[in-house]
């Protein structure tokens, strides 16, 4: 399970080094194999261990190619999907189209989301945190039935 937010840097070749605390679990549990794709609702990337991504693909197979919304989702998620492997130094090479989609600059944030990571441009992440705070204060948040029994 992946949790926490880590500041990371992109090098001039478009590589990011995964923080050391995640490298061993990724290597042992997932053979260092990942799939990177785009988030269809935010300007960030999603990094899934290959086994977790296989579950997503099984769901995508059930979607129709004739319904515009379902086809659009498949196009985005599968069209940008890039299979990769951590190198010996724990780095991933991010293809240019993915870096462009997320507007990634030199400084980025890798954010654990249990079964996957989000990869954000650092400035965009700070903006997203502010938006999330506002959402939590919103009346709709308080009325959300799925969150009614959630407590910390």
UniProtKB/Swiss-Prot annotation:
Any single biological process term in GO: negative regulation of DNA-templated transcription initiation
Signal sequence bounds: none
GO MF annotation, one: transcription cis-regulatory region binding
Domain SpoVT-AbrB: 5-52, 81-124
One GO term describing the cellular component: nucleoid
Keyword Transcription regulation: yes
Cell compartments where the protein resides: Cytoplasm, Nucleoid
Keyword Cytoplasm: yes
Keyword annotations from UniProtKB, A to Z: Cytoplasm, DNA-binding, Repeat, Transcription, Transcription regulation
Database matches in InterPro entries: MraZ, MraZ_C, MraZ_dom, MraZ_N, MraZ_sf, SpoVT-AbrB_dom, SpoVT-AbrB_sf
Family named by the database record: Belongs to the MraZ family.
Subunit field text: Forms oligomers.
Protein name: Transcriptional regulator MraZ
């Amino acid at each position: 399970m992946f949790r926490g937010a880590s500041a990371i840097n992109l090098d001039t070749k478009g590589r990011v080094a995964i923080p050391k605390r995640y490298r061993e679990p990724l290597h042992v549990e997932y053979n260092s194999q990942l799939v990177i794709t785009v988030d269809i609702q935010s300007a960030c990337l999603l990094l899934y261990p290959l086994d977790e991504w296989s579950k997503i693909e099984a769901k995508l197979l059930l979607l129709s190619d004739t319904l515009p919304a379902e086809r659009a989702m498949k196009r985005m998620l599968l069209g940008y999907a890039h299979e990769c492997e951590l190198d010996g130094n724990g780095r991933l090479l991010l293809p240019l189209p993915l870096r462009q989609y997320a507007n990634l600059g030199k400084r980025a944030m890798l954010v654990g989301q249990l079964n996957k990571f989000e990869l954000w441009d650092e400035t965009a992440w700070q903006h997203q945190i502010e938006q999330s705070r506002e959402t939590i204060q919103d009346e709709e948040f308080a009325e959300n039935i799925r969150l009614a029994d959630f407590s910390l």
